[in-house]
Amino acid sequence: MIYIQRRENRELETVDEFPTLKEARAMLIEYRISDRTATYYLSRRPCKHWRENQ
């Protein structure tokens, strides 16, 4: 799985997951366009809270 992480003011949050890198890259662009106040990037690991909520 590939995860999209959101970082803003030292806060880290996993916002989405995708089975393929191609899908994740396409959505990463959308996240970056829709919210310019945070930094979005791809990761192979989710944040701790993501695993707890799944």
What kind of feature is each model-predicted range?
Residues 13, 25, 29-54:
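Short, mixed-charge low-complexity intrinsically disordered segments
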Residues 1-30:
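N-terminal acidic leader/helix
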